[in-house]
């Protein structure tokens, strides 16, 4: 577990478990957005030494997207439209203006988003062991990857 100033709200897990299919759709869209974000960071000349690393992260996020998309199809769940995340929107609104600040803040924001995802995936993996073992295993497998993305973005910043 990562150490955060604020923990995940206590009502988060019951809400997720009550609408697991909706959460899977949302997660699928978020993986696509994460891939796009990693690719968008390549535009900054300050990150030229990290282009391959960012490209690798984007590829991994697209693999996660495909994994979730296939899971949705298997479960007969419609893909649906993406939903805005108030938490992610809140993180992104603190990105400062100015080239240097923007680069650093985008990397920190990406790190925070990946880190929180890692924490939530650990909770989901444990909570779904008995009722949804395949999904539990998927989330357990995603923990390492998301944790790696968290640290890569943090170190780039």
Can you annotate each of these PLM segments?
Residues 1-157:
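Non-heme di-metal
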